[in-house]
């Protein structure tokens, strides 16, 4: 019922204690972490702590092994697909930051969980009868306060502050609103009435764009109108925004934060920007169809699905990714 280090403390990089980590209520920034929380913590919080520990990923690995055996996955005359999302590491990163002992420990434990799963597949399915694609949906920013302590520009931009600045600017020019319905991280959503005016006159939102652009931590502010058509833009920021844009779900105005600035005050750190550290993730393949090696050609998590599909001669013509042919056995 306690999460402690898998290895000795000397095998971890950096100090365990950090003034910048925002541990969840019931925990501190120091190992060990009782899954029951501190004394007086409601028993129901056990599941919250368990989910935000490496033990949830270990459980998922055991459950996957059970599914393979129970449903004879990979052991029949058919192609089976098993998708797993090891999300415990994400929670740990949000709570303690990417340089913490907790993240290092979660990675070490996840490595063991994967080793056990692959060993089971080798013995149950056969080493030459399965292929694995492993990646991540995002990277992570360092803790802004830790970066700022090194003399580097960093900080937090809060949704409420963006909304206040945007609404004040729009009211000053266009009269009493409301004009802004919601600010959600990098997305600013206009009210229905304001959106109707913006569709008729793209310059309508300019007061908001100008005001938010002057805020600390803001790199760019621009309209999302027609953004879905700019996926091939030479501008890396615009292209990244376009790749993540959905015309029916995304905001009317996109706010891009400067490097090392994040848009939340409720967790130690987060992700979700166009910055390289948020896009830098591994793309790893395992199995007989693949050549061992490290490849320096550009790749993306979007390439995993078409590459795996190619193994069963299935094409994905509308996929964003490509088949990573350089990694395949000829």
Task: State each model region's role.
Residues 53-61, 103, 107-111, 197-205, ...:
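Solvent-exposed, acidic/flexible segments
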Residues 314-330:
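C-terminal beta-strand edge segments of enzyme domains
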Residues 85-87, 136-139, 320-324:
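Short, solvent-exposed turn/loop segments enriched in Gly/Ser/Thr/Pro and often Arg
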Residues 50-76, 89-130, 205-207, 211, ...:
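A long, amphipathic alpha-helix that forms part
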Residues 1-23, 101, 112, 116-261:
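Secreted, luminal/periplasmic, and some membrane-associated catalytic domains
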Residues 47-73, 77-83, 88-90, 256-258, ...:
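Extracellular low-complexity, Gly/Ser/Thr-rich intrinsically disordered linkers
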Residues 149, 157-200, 270-312, 328-330:
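Substrate-binding rim/cap in mid-to-C-terminal beta-strand-loop elements of soluble/periplasmic
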Residues 1-78, 87-94, 214-220:
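His/Asp/Glu-rich, glycine-adjacent segments
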